[in-house]
């Protein structure tokens, strides 16, 4: 499978469509919650779509507009054009992302990609560019006879296991091939800690490209898995008693080609700006946990005992901390935020991480001393004495923190902020009204 030539202009895309016999192009964007929205246009309509955009009804999209002001258009981004390698080569199908605009030609402020681009502009004003390297984990489950997803395991493998314990290595290989064909640089692919859990790591990149890649990654993983008879789930905690799936986010700032976080003259080899960036993340993380960990199920992962963070602290190597500093230095110096999960909208999550870090640098926010002990072994009193706070315990607590946050409101903009909170409050209200199997198991026979 040969990696396709990267397109940067409309002309590049039109030439590739002709050379590769592409018949349909799936135009895509995400709603406020990060769910992909897509519709196909025939290749003959592509040039006009580049010229005039693709019109759609925004009132039918989560978090967009009311029915009386619903006309919107998608402006295609040629740099995101990719041919889908699992589709037939003859009469091929491609995918392209875009930016959402209003009919008057102004960007739609409710577009998650716009929110991230606005944060990027703030960084550029300070002379910075942001790189991100996410680590996405997922489960592969069996399908039932009707092709619907189950939670039936595909194997009993563990961390770094291989065949026969890892029964999905061929599926991962096919996913790797497809991603590489679509321009990803795959760095590692392996079985994770939990049964049927997997991780595929791709090389870091600039923050907008990486957010696009997260959207593409989930789309590719789900598509290939389904073609192979599996269901790929990015649900944070689909199974009780085993590790959940995270999206650890490694991040760094660059200026004039140099890593801003690296300083060879300090004991930790971390710059003062790196420390302030950490301080900004620690200060604001509770306010935007509802975005990095966006669903009710997210908080079943953020509990002690399963390698997920619970407490707000930082450390050089301590994996019980929220923020870890991997050992690599030089241009590889980075900060790893460990709470995000793959259910998040990457555009919004990365925008908030960047904004929080920038505010830390602007306001010289001190992160305090690193916590180099296992935080889970500390008593409540010891954590209190060290000033270690906890992440929100559930989605309701996260929503309440976000509602009172001037920082998050300014970072997301009024439209996204209000629509996102409305959607999350509805989700929580629906959840709390449902009678869960645990309640029946616990109480039915005794009460």
UniProtKB/Swiss-Prot annotation:
Ranges for domain GS catalytic come to 112-447
The note on cofactor binding and number reads:
Binds 2 Mg(2+) ions per subunit.
Annotated ATP binding lies at 187, 252, 319, 324
Which positions does UniProt annotate for L-glutamate binding?
243-244, 301, 307, 319, 338
Taxonomic classification: Archaea, Methanobacteriati, Methanobacteriota, Stenosarchaea group, Methanomicrobia
Keyword check for Magnesium: yes
- Function (record text): Probably involved in nitrogen metabolism via ammonium assimilation. Catalyzes the ATP-dependent biosynthesis of glutamine from glutamate and ammonia.
How is this protein's activity controlled? Directly stimulated by the effector molecule 2-oxoglutarate. Inhibited by GlnK1. 2-oxoglutarate antagonizes the inhibitory effects of GlnK1, but does not prevent GlnK1/GlnA1 complex formation.
Q: Which PROSITE patterns match?
A: GLNA_1 (PS00180), GLNA_ATP (PS00181), GS_BETA_GRASP (PS51986), GS_CATALYTIC (PS51987)
Identify this protein by name.
Glutamine synthetase
Q: Which SUPFAM superfamilies match?
A: Glutamine synthetase, N-terminal domain (SSF54368), Glutamine synthetase/guanido kinase (SSF55931)
Cofactor dependence is on: Mg(2+)
Q: Where does Mg(2+) 2 bind?
A: 137, 192, 199
Q: What class of enzyme is it?
A: ligase
Q: Which UniProt keywords apply?
A: ATP-binding, Cytoplasm, Ligase, Magnesium, Metal-binding, Nucleotide-binding
What subcellular locations does the record give?
A: Cytoplasm
Q: Which Gene3D superfamilies match?
A: Glutamine synthetase, N-terminal domain, Glutamine synthetase/guanido kinase, catalytic domain
Positions contributing to Mg(2+) 1 binding: 135, 248, 336
| SMART domains referenced in this protein's UniProt entry, alphabetically | Gln-synt_C (SM01230)
A GO biological process of this protein is:
glutamine biosynthetic process
